[in-house]
């Protein structure tokens, strides 16, 4: 399969989230469960395997913006070549800050998400995702400052 088709199937799975159970998205169908690498921005870091990814990023992110909608990005760039694919959006999604994130309590604000994702596939599964998020702008969009995170007032990293 072309990496774009594998990626698109995974994105459709993200839309199946029932708001409670991560398995409702069936990510195990799309990722190499044991060997996947997810490399995120400074505040999250490198996660290996689906379990670690879901525990340290996906579950927290979904708590932060459970109503996320990635179909609303104004400017999207999508490309794929063989076993690689990329997706960028400015903004990448619309959402509402509804849960604690990096120690920031929800205030109902609409965070801005500028994201660039780069994926590698190994046949039928995604194996790598380099996910770059403008965290400084994300924090500012919910009226928080980067320094609050850096000063150690918040603890997110495992």
Model regions and ranges:
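C-terminal and inter-domain tail/linker signature
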Residues: 1-158
């Amino acid at each position: 399969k072309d990496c774009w088709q594998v990626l698109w199937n995974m994105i459709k799975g993200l839309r199946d989230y029932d708001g409670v159970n991560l398995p409702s998205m069936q990510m195990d169908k799309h990722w190499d469960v044991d060997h996947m690498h997810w490399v995120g921005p400074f505040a999250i870091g490198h996660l290996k395997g689906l379990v670690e990814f879901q525990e340290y990023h996906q579950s927290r992110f979904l708590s932060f913006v459970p109503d996320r909608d990635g179909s609303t990005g104004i400017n999207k760039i999508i490309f794929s070549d063989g076993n690689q694919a990329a997706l960028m959006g400015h903004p990448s999604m619309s959402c509402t800050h509804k849960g604690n994130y990096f120690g920031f309590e929800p205030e109902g604000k609409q965070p801005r998400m500028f994201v660039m994702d780069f994926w590698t596939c190994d046949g039928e599964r995604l194996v790598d995702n380099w996910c770059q998020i403008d965290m400084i702008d994300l924090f500012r969009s919910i009226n928080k400052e980067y320094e609050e995170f850096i000063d150690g007032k918040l603890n997110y990293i495992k």
